[in-house]
Amino acid sequence: MEPAGERFPEQRQVLILLLLLEVTLAGWEPRRYSVMEETERGSFVANLANDLGLGVGELAERGARVVSEDNEQGLQLDLQTGQLILNEKLDREKLCGPTEPCIMHFQVLLKKPLEVIRAELLVTDINDHSPEFPEREITLKIPETSSLGTVFPLKKARDLDVGSNNVQNYNISPNSHFHVSTRTRGDGRKYPELVLDTELDREEQAELRLTLTAVDGGSPPRSGTVQILILVLDANDNAPEFAQALYEVQVPENSPVGSLVVKVSARDLDTGTNGEISYSLYYSSEEINKPFELSSLSGEIRLIKKLDFETMSSYDLDIEASDGGGLSGKCSVSVKVLDVNDNFPELSISSLTSPIPENSPETEVALFRIRDRDSGENGKMICSIQDDVPFKLKPSVENFYRLVTEGALDRETRAEYNITITITDLGTPRLKTQHNITVLVSDVNDNAPAFTQTSYTLFVRENNSPALHIGSVSATDRDSGTNAQVTYSLLPPQDPHLPLASLVSINTDNGHLFALRSLDYEALQAFEFHVGATDRGSPALSSEALVRVLVLDANDNSPFVLYPLQNGSAPCTELVPRAAEPGYVVTKVVAVDGDSGQNAWLSYQLLKATEPGLFGVWAHNGEVRTARLLSERDVAKHRLVVLVKDNGEPPRSATATLQVLLVDGFSQPYLPLPEAAPAQAQADSLTVYLVVALASVSSLFLFSVLLFVAVRLCRRSRAASVGRYSVPEGPFPGHRVDVSGTGTLSQSYQYEVCLTGGSESNDFKFLKPIFPNIVSQDSRRKSEFLE
């Protein structure tokens, strides 16, 4: 319980002011219906569909329900016909007791939109109970000296029916001394009084027996009887007389058992036994008498049972004081029960919707009614929910409330809400009731799948096996159920020339990517595409991510020697003057490698030589140089084998064979002579050949210059279509050579006289210029560089 002085925070609180509600609804008259009690179950009461102006189908569509006080199911609404029928046989006396009229309050609830229609069912009384006296016989002691017209109160009969069906009249069997007078109390109840018509004489007749009959006003009337035994006494001049004819007292309903309610007091002027007074409850129903106990000696009335204001708010007791001589007096005690705040507020749920979709603002979650059985301030209530939930309360009529969502919910943020509805009355001390409602939030497909990365980079080494798993993409969906089930797909590539469908595939369930065929770094070094992730919601949502596939180079290409030409014909002969200094550049071996990175780093070394130590090869650039001074003792013809090796793992290599001819000077070169020719013939032939060669070289030199200019201009337009071999990235190691064409032969064009040692005709062969920077990416194009 909360203290009386507690201030309520300004939260979602709705103050239920009953008086204000009554004023608001004062002009809203409820619909009234009536039915007789004891009507059989299933009987027709009214056609609600017609009364409300609704079609029969609308009642079912709007979820029509009948809600009565205390959730009693006395009425039932047939949604198919719109008829209101009895769900059970009604007993007016059980429902309302002596209260008249007997009205059952109920409401008709309609949804979409919410509408509460108040209605009342009047249960009319039928005459199904006969009057009953509390005792079978009433004994009266009347002094023989009683004067004519003396009135003697009689115990009244009890009839559970009300109105005209209750007791309307009393009569007595014919006799010569008494008649019965029927009186009406302020509350409308009738009671009998016996009136003395003629004097009594004890000596003549000591006792009389009469029959008192109570008759109700029903049709047909019912009656009940009791025997009256009149004992004629000797004279007792004074009857007991109460100090007050009416005692009015107020008792709080929480008074403890045994507490004093009131003390009545009467006096008798007689003496002896005629003056001894005893008190008794004259007549009241068992329901009225049950909470009280009257002391016959002291007149004290005490509680023997706790009172309940909500069950019965007042009691009327009739007290009789009798003396020893048979005379008696009567008074009334009116006990008004004062209400205290002893009832906690009550809440009853009429409808509850759970789960609710997450994207549905202003959705009705629950419809409930509150009440407090106390009265006044004790019955006023405050209804609220906690602040940290996106819900609010909307008051309706007849203490009904709607719990609705305050805005759109987000299941991904919170999927379940525990809402505590707190009802606090304004009594002292304040009492409160809390009711917990669990609301589940159902998922709506409002979240698209999200990839764990906006882009993925995958590395695949070339020459892979088909169906190789090269990587995975992953996306998650914050929704649940089928809305969170993600399927993956390949999106059409932006490059229309990329054959994506033949390169990779994706597992639609888990996002695994597979290479469909073996990749070739030299043909395709990298490609990119987009993958999509789509959920199974309705409508489906999707997202995409970029995937880059980088093909890693493998050392699958051997070095290719561009110069000297290795085409299976006799190797060209390099001419070296014998006067050449050490370090003289004889020629340069030019080679390329189709791989990239360190797989394309080339190194050169002299593998074989006719005379070791005479020539050397620079490992960096493939230049063949003289290692020392030449002498006359050195043979004229030398054969060199140069090894070109890359830096791959395992390394690949190629060889180049060089023929070197030592001559005394370019004007009189030494030529290898055929072994079978005579010396004179060789000398004559050599002279002729040299003359022809010099003339030819001069002419061809001019022609070659012109041809070179034309070829350069022509090949510039074709340079874009000619592939280039990859060159290594980063710092180039000291012992490797870059084959990008920056060597000594890259900017020069050599025209050399090649002599075939085995030819008797000693023909000259002319080599066209070599362009080492323009290379081919396949074996077919490699041959095009040497015409």
From Swiss-Prot:
<feature type="domain" description="Cadherin 6">
    <location>
        <begin position="568"/>
        <end position="671"/>
    </location>
</feature>
<keyword id="KW-0732">Signal</keyword>
<feature type="domain" description="Cadherin 5">
    <location>
        <begin position="456"/>
        <end position="561"/>
    </location>
</feature>
<keyword id="KW-1133">Transmembrane helix</keyword>
<dbReference type="Pfam" id="PF00028">
    <property type="entry name" value="Cadherin"/>
</dbReference>
<dbReference type="GO" id="GO:0032391">
    <property type="term" value="C:photoreceptor connecting cilium"/>
</dbReference>
<keyword id="KW-0812">Transmembrane</keyword>
<dbReference type="GO" id="GO:0007155">
    <property type="term" value="P:cell adhesion"/>
</dbReference>
<dbReference type="GO" id="GO:0007156">
    <property type="term" value="P:homophilic cell adhesion via plasma membrane adhesion molecules"/>
</dbReference>
<feature type="signal peptide">
    <location>
        <begin position="1"/>
        <end position="26"/>
    </location>
</feature>
<keyword id="KW-0472">Membrane</keyword>
<dbReference type="InterPro" id="IPR013164">
    <property type="entry name" value="Cadherin_N"/>
</dbReference>
<dbReference type="InterPro" id="IPR050174">
    <property type="entry name" value="Protocadherin/Cadherin-CA"/>
</dbReference>
<feature type="domain" description="Cadherin 3">
    <location>
        <begin position="247"/>
        <end position="347"/>
    </location>
</feature>
<keyword id="KW-1003">Cell membrane</keyword>
<dbReference type="Pfam" id="PF08266">
    <property type="entry name" value="Cadherin_2"/>
</dbReference>
<dbReference type="GO" id="GO:0005886">
    <property type="term" value="C:plasma membrane"/>
</dbReference>
<feature type="domain" description="Cadherin 2">
    <location>
        <begin position="138"/>
        <end position="242"/>
    </location>
</feature>
<feature type="glycosylation site" description="N-linked (GlcNAc...) asparagine">
    <location>
        <position position="436"/>
    </location>
</feature>
<feature type="glycosylation site" description="N-linked (GlcNAc...) asparagine">
    <location>
        <position position="418"/>
    </location>
</feature>
<feature type="domain" description="Cadherin 1">
    <location>
        <begin position="35"/>
        <end position="133"/>
    </location>
</feature>
<dbReference type="InterPro" id="IPR015919">
    <property type="entry name" value="Cadherin-like_sf"/>
</dbReference>
<keyword id="KW-0130">Cell adhesion</keyword>
<protein>
    <recommendedName>
        <fullName>Protocadherin beta-15</fullName>
    </recommendedName>
</protein>
<keyword id="KW-0677">Repeat</keyword>
<feature type="topological domain" description="Extracellular">
    <location>
        <begin position="27"/>
        <end position="690"/>
    </location>
</feature>
<feature type="topological domain" description="Cytoplasmic">
    <location>
        <begin position="712"/>
        <end position="787"/>
    </location>
</feature>
<feature type="glycosylation site" description="N-linked (GlcNAc...) asparagine">
    <location>
        <position position="567"/>
    </location>
</feature>
<dbReference type="InterPro" id="IPR032455">
    <property type="entry name" value="Cadherin_C"/>
</dbReference>
<keyword id="KW-0106">Calcium</keyword>
<dbReference type="InterPro" id="IPR020894">
    <property type="entry name" value="Cadherin_CS"/>
</dbReference>
<dbReference type="Pfam" id="PF16492">
    <property type="entry name" value="Cadherin_C_2"/>
</dbReference>
<dbReference type="GO" id="GO:0007399">
    <property type="term" value="P:nervous system development"/>
</dbReference>
<feature type="transmembrane region" description="Helical">
    <location>
        <begin position="691"/>
        <end position="711"/>
    </location>
</feature>
<dbReference type="GO" id="GO:0005509">
    <property type="term" value="F:calcium ion binding"/>
</dbReference>
<feature type="domain" description="Cadherin 4">
    <location>
        <begin position="352"/>
        <end position="451"/>
    </location>
</feature>
<dbReference type="InterPro" id="IPR002126">
    <property type="entry name" value="Cadherin-like_dom"/>
</dbReference>
<keyword id="KW-0325">Glycoprotein</keyword>
<comment type="function">
    <text>Potential calcium-dependent cell-adhesion protein. May be involved in the establishment and maintenance of specific neuronal connections in the brain.</text>
</comment>
